[in-house]
Amino acid sequence: MYAPASTRSWQAGRERVLYRISDYRDCQSHGPTIAERVWTAWWQDSGLKVGDVAEHLQDMTNPHKLPTGFVAHDGDDYVGSAFLIHCDLEERPQYLPWVAALWVEEGRRRSGVARALMQAATQRAAELGHEASYLCCQRDLEAYYINCGWTVLERGVGKHDLTMLTFSTNI
């Protein structure tokens, strides 16, 4: 079973900043912030309301099935989050599971938080018996994910011209 990542640290100038990756079910107090970030980044033009996204988070409280979520936090402060879900790209429903809604607060970016969140999600996928995880992104983010160990499967997918990537969990 997934164990929360140990406390990680990084140096920002002279300030030492710590964060921890936890299962969403242990950090549900961050739910309203996560819902707002996810809604603002990906759903505000879709007709969904923030409350709809918050309601979806209720489905992420069972560690033995999808969907599930992960939270990066510094004590009570939200740092970032990621989901592991059934499908994130309606044009490719045959692939499962998907790392989705990866978000890191602007002041905490470029510090390894996103990579740690992806690692937690892909580790959970392996624990659930999946040999690979999938992710989609805009073309300008493709190089970042490749650098994190993901492999491009397909480019130009769907109406948003997304890149689809995979990560082998080697179970």
What are these regions (language model features)?
Residues 104, 110-123:
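Conserved acetyl-CoA-binding loop-helix of GNAT-fold acetyltransferases
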Residues 69-71, 77-87, 98, 103:
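Conserved beta-strand in the GNAT
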Residues 60-65:
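Short loop/turn motifs at secondary-structure junctions and domain boundaries
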Residues 125-137:
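Conserved GNAT acetyl-CoA-binding A-motif
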Residues 1-33, 170-171:
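Conserved N-terminal entry element of GNAT/NAT acetyltransferase domains
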Residues 4, 136-139, 148, 154-171:
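C-terminal "cap" of GNAT-fold acetyltransferases
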Residues 29, 35-58:
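Conserved GNAT-fold acetyl-CoA-binding loop/helix
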